[in-house]
């Protein structure tokens, strides 16, 4: 199926879902605030070949990135019914470059070969920057990127993440500003320059409750 047709079908799937996946029931809004938001600030080279989407919910941004750029996505979320729904719909649409796992990001380190495994990590609307860095950095290769979708509040969160960045082996490389229907949005791009200590991510809930300071 052609890319734009796949995007259209996937959005229709999201807005008609019986479980509340994305908070939009209008096609045009969902098209802009989900698909355009996911793809506009991204470049194919950011993702590399394999990326992880932590807290993908309804497959955002992971499904749209896989369709748009052809990279292989590994999409995780702690809510199994969301992952099941998204997985089934992607299978129906024959989107083949995606894998899914229902798991907390904190627990992925004990499952499979995923430590320092991905070329990049993406995450949108999951938690504050310091928390999300702890949930993503351990799974990205040295030299890879972490790309976080944020609103205008990102500056304060970034200021509170200086120690987390140092501790996790990541540094800020770029902030890409873009606008969706008059709303300012930012893609915060980090580079992983060093290995992340084995103790990260800490136990379930700790990255959220006690972000690295
Ligand atoms: C507000 S939703 C955002 C979903 C999607 N990324 C989007 O932009 O529409 C946050 C999602 O993150 C998931 N989540 C939160 N903490 C998580 C964790 N530690 N590990 C895996 N998933 C997590 C939640 O289950 C939820 O589906």
What does each of the following model-derived ranges do?
Residues 119-131, 138, 152:
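A short SAM/SAH-binding and catalytic strip from SAM-dependent methyltransferases
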Residues 72-77:
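Conserved SAM-binding motif I beta-strand of class I
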Residues 140-142:
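Helix-to-beta-strand junctions that scaffold the AdoMet/dcAdoMet cofactor pocket
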Residues 58-70:
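Conserved SAM-binding loop of SAM-dependent methyltransferases across substrates and taxa
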Residues 160-213:
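SAM/dcSAM-binding transferase cores
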Residues 109-120:
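A short acidic, Gly/Pro-enriched loop at the edge of an enzyme's catalytic core
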Residues 102-109:
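Conserved SAM/SAH-binding loop
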Residues 1-48, 52, 81, 87-98:
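Class I SAM-dependent transferase core
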């Amino acid at each position: 199926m052609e890319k734009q047709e796949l995007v259209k079908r996937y959005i229709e799937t999201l807005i008609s879902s019986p479980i509340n996946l994305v908070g939009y029931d209008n096609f045009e809004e969902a098209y802009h605030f989900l698909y355009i938001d996911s793809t506009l600030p991204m470049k194919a080279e950011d993702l590399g070949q394999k990326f992880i989407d932590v807290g993908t919910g309804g497959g955002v941004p992971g499904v749209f990135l896989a369709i748009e750029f052809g990279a292989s996505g590994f999409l995780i979320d702690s809510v199994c019914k969301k992952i099941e729904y998204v997985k089934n719909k992607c299978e129906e649409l024959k989107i083949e470059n995606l894998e899914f796992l229902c798991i907390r990001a904190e627990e992925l380190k004990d499952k499979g070969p995923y430590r320092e495994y991905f070329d990049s990590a993406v995450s949108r609307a999951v938690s504050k920057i310091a928390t999300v860095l702890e949930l993503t950095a351990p799974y990205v290769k040295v030299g890879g990127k972490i790309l976080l979708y944020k609103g205008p509040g990102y500056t304060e969160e970034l200021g509170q993440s200086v120690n987390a960045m140092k501790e996790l082996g990541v540094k800020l490389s770029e902030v890409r500003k873009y606008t969706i229907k008059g709303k300012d949005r930012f893609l915060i791009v980090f580079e992983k320059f060093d290995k992340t200590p084995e103790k990260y991510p800490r136990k379930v809930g700790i990255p959220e409750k006690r972000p690295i300071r």
